[in-house]
From Swiss-Prot:
Protein name: Protein LDOC1
Induction remark: Down-regulated by muramyl-dipeptide and lipopolysaccharide.
Main location group: nucleus
Origin species: Homo sapiens (Human)
Tissue: Ubiquitously expressed with high levels in brain ant thyroid and low expression in placenta, liver and leukocytes. Expressed as well in six of the seven human breast cancer cell lines examined.
Amino acid sequence: MVDELVLLLHALLMRHRALSIENSQLMEQLRLLVCERASLLRQVRPPSCPVPFPETFNGESSRLPEFIVQTASYMLVNENRFCNDAMKVAFLISLLTGEAEEWVVPYIEMDSPILGDYRAFLDEMKQCFGWDDDEDDDDEEEEDDY
């Protein structure tokens, strides 16, 4: 019984050693691929964006519709960069300043689920910074298209 356990332990140690070596080789290959990718990316010039980068939003209610249209348009033409709701919300947050930036801090501090839900985040912004219901109906069609 003890001999069998010793043999089993020896086999496990040999397997562990082989897997460790294989893991090291794979990590080295990954490192080389990451370096090659970085080198290739430096050689490629990204196409110019037909939509200008959105302006920041400081919480001024009258600018909210403009901000939402600008950001939605920018994300639409750069959809490969904004592949999920969390990326879209993070992009919006990166453009907040002043009162709007202060407003979002508690959501970030408590890791609110709203940070992963683009539609809910927009609704919360509209509620906080004011939104005319007539404009909401028109702009909602644009956002749904996105």
